[in-house]
């Protein structure tokens, strides 16, 4: 087997690589789903590739065929240029059968096998033509598509096939990530829970013993500094002594130049700060007073899908495949194990159509995760305050749980938070779905194992909701992996905030969605009225998440608010709709939109 100099375009694993992977997977997994076809041949594409004829007519001359090709592809293959593009097949998998399966493991296995079977039975004729023509390519299964590097003639030849639905670009997307504030080491201030965490009423849920135990949250971002003191204890690959990154980490960055994490990092590494920060807000707690995370009892895994903030649809899809069925380091999706899939994913990134990202490219992958019982939580975007600025995939999709940002400690929408309705796809869908604190959020930095920084953005609001979902599923296991019912539970329990800026007041509306997250209300507890800047302390007795109702063992005291004693017992009734706290309809208070600074390249942690 020829060595592949560019892992972006992969081969069927060599014999030695198969043996390596089988050591992890065992004979049962080895006998499972067959290889996902992908190959690369070093030769340049054959000149005859674009001269294929059918019935004496040169392929690609027909306007219908050319209409399948996205404008980005046409532009970037002009004058003989080569570009990367997706060949999306017309025959996509039907995953509706997963809805009738009772457990996450059954859903995930069904979705994985259905998708892989569909890709194998439909892609082979195209793959064979690409191999014969010496054209670089890689197969994907979560979207039945093939990534190709080729010329305009190759794109036209593929578009002419009746089994091809469209040819879409793989542009480099420059995410406008928030800028970090000053970095602090070993903060000396009294131990407190972060104000944004308190404002969601998460500590009241902790007091019942529900901290997210047995829930796994996945980070799709710039990577994660896994050795950080607030993250390492919560990494699924850490057993207290050693780190095991198999099934717990994947790097989709294969061809970066000068990235501090390099390419194909075999261990979690963050090349900016963004991924460590968002992961910390979801699950972070160093055990020494830095209570920065919503669900400190949950575990995390990760996949780097951005190179210092720059992503591509292929990188995004590669990470979504890894989350659907994680696989060991140095292995391929063929060795995936869907039973190791996370429960929830954090997605503080976007794929703007204005940069060439098709509104359709990622949709099938998002829907596949939902069918498998994985909740994809997505940042609404930082293009506010005009209406219809929720315009980037994946935030625009129905199956994405899209999050707006509040000015922390208030019920005012942040000025930068994107608004709906979604018009880019013609749906007029109400977005965001829900809102959470997203300004001056303190969490992990990637510059050191005891370093913290602050940042603002819908990126920061998103992990609050990922953590809230983990707490919900921990407290009410009957809702676990029931995506629609779980979202309804959080939406109905939210503090509804009316706004007519971009449509009717709702709820929901196109500014706040259903309103501010209130996780205590969602699990059936009465919630106190928070102060603008609470500084609570809490001590929770951990318990295994399950159907039994735990006995409260802690009192949560919030400074400058009435003392709330956790005496309510969480119930597992998913049908009751909690009564929302009555609120007035505030006018959004404008706040200055922070401008990103040039992305730094901090030194990554030492290789374990």
Functional labels for PLM-detected ranges:
Residues 43-48, 527-607:
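Ser/Thr-rich, Proline-interspersed low-complexity disordered segments
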Residues 46-48, 52-55, 110, 161-216, ...:
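Protease zymogen maturation seam
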Residues 52-182:
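Inhibitory N-terminal propeptides of secreted protease zymogens
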Residues 61, 72-75, 194, 292, ...:
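C-terminal subdomain of the subtilisin-like protease fold in secreted/lumenal serine endopeptidases
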Residues 80, 98-99, 166, 193, ...:
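Subtilisin-like serine protease catalytic core
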Residues 301-309, 438-506:
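Hydrolase catalytic cores
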Residues 323-357, 379-380:
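Short acidic, glycine-rich surface-loop motifs adjacent to enzyme active sites
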């Amino acid at each position: 087997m020829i060595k592949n100099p560019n892992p972006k375009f992969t081969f069927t694993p060599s014999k030695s690589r198969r043996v390596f992977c089988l050591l992890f997977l065992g004979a049962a997994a080895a006998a499972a789903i067959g290889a996902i076809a992908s190959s690369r041949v070093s030769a340049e594409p054959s000149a005859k590739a674009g001269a294929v004829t059918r019935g004496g007519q040169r392929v690609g001359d027909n306007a219908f065929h050319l209409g399948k090709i996205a404008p980005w592809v046409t532009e970037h293959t002009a004058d003989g240029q080569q570009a990367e593009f997706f060949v999306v097949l017309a025959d996509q998998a039907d995953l509706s059968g997963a809805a009738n399966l009772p457990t996450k493991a059954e859903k995930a296995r069904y979705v994985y096998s259905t998708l892989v079977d569909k890709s194998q039975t439909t892609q082979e004729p195209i793959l064979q033509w690409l191999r014969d023509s010496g054209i670089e390519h890689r197969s994907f299964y979560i979207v039945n598509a093939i990534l190709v590097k080729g010329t305009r003639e190759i794109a036209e030849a593929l578009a002419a096939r009746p089994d091809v639905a469209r040819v879409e670009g793989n542009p480099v997307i420059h995410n406008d990530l928030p800028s970090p504030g000053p970095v602090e080491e070993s903060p000396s201030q009294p131990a407190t829970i972060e104000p944004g965490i308190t404002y969601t009423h998460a500590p009241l849920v902790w007091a019942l013993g529900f901290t997210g135990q047995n829930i796994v949250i996945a980070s799709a971002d710039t990577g994660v500094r896994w050795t950080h003191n607030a993250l390492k204890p919560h990494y699924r690959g850490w057993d207290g002594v050693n780190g095991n990154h198999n099934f717990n980490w994947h790097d989709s960055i294969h061809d970066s130049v000068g990235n501090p994490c390099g390419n194909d990092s075999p261990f979690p590494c963050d090349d900016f700060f963004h991924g460590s920060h968002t992961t910390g807000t979801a699950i972070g707690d160093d055990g020494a007073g830095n209570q920065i995370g919503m669900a400190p009892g949950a575990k995390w895994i990760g996949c780097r899908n951005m190179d210092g903030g720059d992503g591509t649809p292929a990188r995004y899809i590669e990470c979504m495949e890894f989350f659907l069925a994680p696989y060991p380091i140095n292995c391929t999706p063929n060795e995936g194990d869907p039973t190791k899939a996370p429960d929830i994913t954090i997605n503080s990134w976007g794929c703007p159509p204005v940069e060439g990202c098709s509104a359709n490219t990622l949709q099938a992958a998002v829907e596949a995760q939902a069918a498998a019982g994985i909740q994809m939580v997505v940042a609404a975007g930082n293009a506010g305050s005009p209406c219809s600025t929720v315009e980037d995939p994946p935030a625009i999709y129905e199956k994405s749980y899209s999050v707006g940002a509040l000015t922390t400690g208030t019920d005012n929408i942040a000025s930068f938070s994107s608004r709906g309705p979604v018009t880019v796809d013609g749906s007029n869908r109400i977005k965001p779905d829900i809102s959470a604190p997203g300004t001056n959020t303190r969490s992990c930095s990637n510059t050191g194992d005891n370093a913290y920084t602050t940042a603002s953005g819908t990126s920061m609001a998103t992990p609050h909701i990922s953590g809230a979902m983990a707490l919900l599923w921990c407290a009410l296991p009957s809702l676990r992996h029931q995506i629609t019912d779980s979202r309804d539970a959080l939406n109905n329990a939210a503090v509804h905030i009316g706004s007519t800026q971009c449509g009717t007041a709702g709820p929901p509306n196109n500014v706040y969605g259903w309103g501010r997250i209130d996780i205590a209300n969602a699990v059936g507890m009465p919630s106190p009225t928070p102060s603008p800047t609470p500084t609570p302390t809490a001590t929770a007795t951990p318990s295994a998440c399950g159907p039994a109702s735990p006995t409260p063992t802690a009192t949560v005291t919030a400074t400058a608010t009435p003392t709330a004693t956790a005496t309510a017992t969480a119930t597992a009734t998913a049908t009751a709709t909690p009564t929302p706290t009555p609120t007035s309809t505030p006018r959004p208070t404008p706040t200055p939109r922070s401008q990103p600074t040039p992305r730094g390249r901090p030194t990554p942690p030492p290789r374990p």
